[in-house]
């Protein structure tokens, strides 16, 4: 019984650090607006985001002096503004913390801006991992 106490204490003290990993089907529903945008299929998106963030909406990654946020790993160097990087260009005009929730509306709008400016290869996982053989990424209900 004693080893359970520290685990319980950690889950009470740090409830906000729990990851929210979406399934392919959940993500397909949330990303409807992106399907076919700039000729990128939903299966390409699911594959790319799986290899970018593990489909985790709350993930942050520190990367060469900037931080990347959420399922799309949106950087505070250019796309959003954070406390750590208040000098960001903030092209998406959004606080980075907004990309760490399960409401993907603002994430999708920013992803569309990134796509318009840089294309799908902005997400480095796309070209080597998500350019072909995408059947496994389709939502099958």
From Swiss-Prot:
- Key words of the record: Calcium, Disulfide bond, Glycoprotein, Lactose biosynthesis, Metal-binding, Milk protein, Secreted, Signal
One cellular component (GO) term of this entry: extracellular region
Q: What is its main location?
A: secreted
Recorded hits in SMART domains, A to Z, give: LYZ1 (SM00263)
Q: List the disulfide bonds.
A: 25-139, 47-130, 80-96, 92-110
Enumerate the residues binding Ca(2+).
101, 106-107
> Mind listing the GO biological process terms from this record?
defense response to Gram-negative bacterium; defense response to Gram-positive bacterium; lactose biosynthetic process
Q: Where does the C-type lysozyme domain lie?
A: 20-141
Q: Where in the cell is it found?
A: Secreted
- Pfam families hit by this protein: Lys
Question: Where is the secretion signal located?
Answer: 1-19
**Glycosylated residues (UniProt):** 64
GO MF, one annotated term: lactose synthase activity
**UniProt xrefs under InterPro entries:** Glyco_hydro_22, Glyco_hydro_22_CS, Lactalbumin, Lysozyme-like_dom_sf
Tissue specificity, per the record, is: Mammary gland specific. Secreted in milk.
* Domain of life from the UniProt record: Eukaryota
For this protein, the record's PANTHER family field holds: ALPHA-LACTALBUMIN, LYSOZYME C
UniProt function note: Regulatory subunit of lactose synthase, changes the substrate specificity of galactosyltransferase in the mammary gland making glucose a good acceptor substrate for this enzyme. This enables LS to synthesize lactose, the major carbohydrate component of milk. In other tissues, galactosyltransferase transfers galactose onto the N-acetylglucosamine of the oligosaccharide chains in glycoproteins.
Q: Describe the family membership recorded for this protein in Swiss-Prot or TrEMBL.
A: Belongs to the glycosyl hydrolase 22 family.
Record text on subunit structure and interactions: Lactose synthase (LS) is a heterodimer of a catalytic component, beta1,4-galactosyltransferase (beta4Gal-T1) and a regulatory component, alpha-lactalbumin (LA).
Q: What is this protein called?
A: Alpha-lactalbumin
Natural source organism: Oryctolagus cuniculus (Rabbit)
The coding gene here is LALBA
């Amino acid at each position: 019984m004693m080893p359970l106490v520290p685990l319980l204490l950690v889950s009470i003290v740090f409830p906000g650090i729990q990851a929210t990993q979406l399934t392919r089907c959940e993500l397909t529903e949330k990303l409807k607006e992106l399907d076919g945008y700039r000729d990128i299929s939903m299966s390409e998106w699911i594959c790319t985001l799986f290899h970018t963030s593990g489909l985790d909406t709350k993930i942050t990654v520190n990367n060469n002096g900037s931080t990347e946020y959420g399922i799309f790993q949106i950087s505070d160097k250019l796309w959003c503004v954070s406390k750590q990087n208040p000098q960001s260009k903030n092209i998406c005009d959004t606080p980075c913390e907004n990309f760490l929730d399960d409401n993907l509306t603002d994430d999708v709008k920013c992803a569309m801006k990134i796509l318009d400016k840089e294309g799908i290869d902005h997400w480095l996982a796309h070209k080597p991992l998500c350019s072909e053989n995408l059947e496994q990424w389709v939502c099958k209900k």
